[in-house]
Amino acid sequence: MDAALKQEVKDWIADDPDPATALALTELVNRGDEATLRKYFSGFLQFGTAGLRGPIGPGPSCMNRAVVGRTAAGIAAYMKKRGMNSVVIGRDARYGSEDFTFETAEIMSGAGMKVFILPRPLPTPVLAFATSALKCDIGIMVTASHNPPEDNGYKVYIGPVADGINYAASQIINPTDGFIASDIAAVRSLKSQPRGSEWTILGEEEVDEYIKRSSALAPRPSDIKIVYTAMHGVGTETLKKVFTQAGFNNLITVDEQCTPDPDFPTVAFPNPEEPGAIDLALAKAREVDADLVIANDPDADRCAAAINDPVVGWRMLRGDELGIIFGEWIARTHPKGTFGNSIVSSSALRKICAHYGINFQEVLTGFKWLAKIEDLAFGYEEAIGYSVDSKTVNDKDGISAAIFLAQIASDLAKSGLTLTDLLNEVWGRHGFHGTEQISIRVADMSSIARLLNGLRKSPPSEIAGRAVKSIDDLAAPQDGLPPTDGLRIWLDGDIRIIVRPSGTEAKMKCYIEVITATSAESQKLLDEIRGPLKEFLS
């Protein structure tokens, strides 16, 4: 075994606070398993605007107590430099989440911080709300959201103004992530960090207030029949309380998926967007003749929905379709403030805002950018993230979105209308906006960089048989957006394609938008483009 690697591993073992991961590494050293050790020691798990996200395992390249402890120490150092002194910590029900929560609490307490801990595994929006309600400087959520079961992660929120940014209890953006990453890198030894045991386990006050505010989004009780799945996550308890308090008592749960289970046994990936993920919910909807299906992802910050389409039967609404439903409804009923969506989301929201005379702002991908819009009345990203009440949660919130959608569906039903009718009205006014996302998994992120750089140096003249009109390099934007890695490609026929690397997984994401007169024309065009585009990008 390489001597330098062996010494690095031994040094890490000596500093590891978790006997289980220390033993796992010791056994690998004793077996001389250099290949596995190199995988676990391929660099410290990268901290960015999404915080931490990675597989649970030993060593600096995985999620474990040693990595989490060093990260907490780095965040504490960042806080001290800015006179911050309070933190609230939440967690989901994934493997390791409770251990990582209390590892963080010990380090923060040892650093002299005032530490609050949510009383049990709860949705991410509750943590975001608690950060604001408690006026904490920092909020930390231990979760990997909708990642595979072997992963865990760490989201960071900032309460006040910091680094010249009015965070208002939202997730970090540049340059804050870089400052924190530098402070994490400066932590040479975890064992040298003082530990404490002074913290407050919160009661139900913050949870109850969140439930009260969310239920107020649906002031008109209804007996609309809704099937709900939590995707084996932590959403069920909180969502049911919100619906009950709002007077929506005809909620039918998918029992196989509504108890927290870190193995996510009924789905290949615990993401409502993944094919097959809500099959059990759709089956239940057919069985009980439901009016609507609602799904949260495991940490309940995202919301998906399915409707009984009069043409094709039960189907998932695309993220953009749900965004357009929310946008049109809020524009009709409360045409105030600023609306926004991300650059990869449908352009239809901009047109809705123009129609109703509402301010609109486009931002980079990631809800952390939408949360920085002043006076945000509604914001969404196509990856089923929605903000319908930014005064309560300045982040995407799958539970408030769920109850608000239920109210919209109920109000429409009282007029003999459906969500499909609402969408058709928008499409009749602005044209049918067909959108689709293609994801291409890669062995490593460097292959995406090579592809994007190749397109920049040698732009194609045509893609999928259609002439390329122009290419916008998002790394050098012309429209006032901050730079980001990706390309926006315009083809003949006002076809928009955006290509960018995923922020959390080893895959490339491609977003297509076509505008046609009808759904059928849109689907035909997407079908023609999809295959050649995947081949071009692979």
Q: PLM features: residue spans?
A:
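An N-terminal, well-structured beta->alpha segment
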Residues: 4-104, 110-111, 200-224, 234
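Gly/Ser/Thr-enriched, mixed-charge loops and adjacent short helices
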Residues: 12-16, 20, 36-40, 45, ...
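Conserved phosphate/anionic-ligand binding catalytic regions in large, soluble enzymes, centered on
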Residues: 41-61, 145-147, 230-238, 242, ...
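N-terminal small/polar loop signature for handling phosphorylated ligands or for N-terminal nucleophile
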Residues: 88-151, 242-305
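Short acidic, glycine/serine/threonine-rich loops at helix termini
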Residues: 98-103, 128-132, 150-156, 192-195, ...
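Short beta-alpha connecting loops at secondary-structure transitions
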Residues: 154-172, 197-199, 262-269, 305-315, ...
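Phosphate-binding and adjacent anionic-ligand microenvironments
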Residues: 286, 290-292, 315, 333-501, ...
